[in-house]
Amino acid sequence: MQQITLSKPVSCYGIGVHSGKRTQLTIEPAKENTGIIFIRTDISSENNYIEAKYFNVSDTLLSTTISNSNKIQVSTIEHIMAALWGCGIDNAVIKIDGPEVPIMDGSSKPFVFMIECAGKKLQNAPKKYLKILKEVTATHKDCELTCTPSDHMKIDLTIDFNSKAIGRQNLVFSKQESFNNNIADARTFGFTKDGDYLQSKGLALGVSFENTIAIDDQDKVLNPDGLRYQDEFVRHKLLDLFGDLYTSGNNIVSSINGYKTSHALNNELLQRIFSDNTSHKFVTASEI
């Protein structure tokens, strides 16, 4: 199994769901072993690039933000990271002229479409996998995320909200190739009761029915077109998990169980994995 990049650059425009700012984003091909790198083209500093790695995650409030040593940052990276993972892209440079990845329709599907339009290119280096060797767990209150050794990827995710519109939902997923058709178009969601508070804090300034599932005080979905799936909420949480875990830099080979996960918990699991050298190793496909 070889590493993969894009065949050519591909671009989009959109607004940030939290900043409300309009940005242009371009995904470009990158050399073998580059990984995923973001470059802030609106900043002239030589240090305007940020590796999309777990150790660069600087904020996990409502989304995942990465920063470099100059405190230059890019926020809400999880949806495009999930798309890159789902499409099997190992190496890419993402150029963006603002602080936040466009929210598009609130899912990963537009980014998947962009990558499919650009095409994929096989590279002359083997794809590397992160194989888990022993159980690692991250917890916060009643929330938990655990990875255990396995010869293939399998995720069992449960969410539980005190909302009749969502409630308790469970999803088991094990085929990366089915991500684009079954998970990628699941949208982000939020509660109208939180809107004023979030906007007073400079968040959710770009929210609309076009990019967010809105749930009102009566636990009703307000979007005119309703849901794309009955369990769209857990599908989106799984999407977020894939995007966050891809900041490991590799596909993870493990059985993963999650309960009420969050961006913070997803990153904490990676921090725990990489803080223990005996918990993992990097392998090629033939070594899995």
From Swiss-Prot:
Binding residue positions for Zn(2+): H79, H236, D240
Protein's GO biological process: lipid A biosynthetic process
Cofactor field: Zn(2+)
Enzyme Commission number(s) from the entry: 3.5.1.108
Signal peptide: none
Entry GO MF terms: metal ion binding; UDP-3-O-acyl-N-acetylglucosamine deacetylase activity
Domain of life: Bacteria
GO CC, any one term: membrane
Catalytic activity: a UDP-3-O-[(3R)-3-hydroxyacyl]-N-acetyl-alpha-D-glucosamine + H2O = a UDP-3-O-[(3R)-3-hydroxyacyl]-alpha-D-glucosamine + acetate
Active site feature: H263 (proton donor)
InterPro entries for this protein: Ribosomal_Su5_D2-typ_SF (IPR020568), UDP-acyl_GlcNac_deAcase (IPR004463), UDP-acyl_GlcNac_deAcase_C (IPR011334), UDP-acyl_N-AcGlcN_deAcase_N (IPR015870)
EC class (word): hydrolase
Keywords: Hydrolase, Lipid A biosynthesis, Lipid biosynthesis, Lipid metabolism, Metal-binding, Zinc
UniProt pathway annotation: Glycolipid biosynthesis; lipid IV(A) biosynthesis; lipid IV(A) from (3R)-3-hydroxytetradecanoyl-[acyl-carrier-protein] and UDP-N-acetyl-alpha-D-glucosamine: step 2/6
Alphabetized HAMAP family for the sequence: LpxC
Family to which this protein belongs: Belongs to the LpxC family.
Protein's job: Catalyzes the hydrolysis of UDP-3-O-myristoyl-N-acetylglucosamine to form UDP-3-O-myristoylglucosamine and acetate, the committed step in lipid A biosynthesis.
Name of this protein: UDP-3-O-acyl-N-acetylglucosamine deacetylase
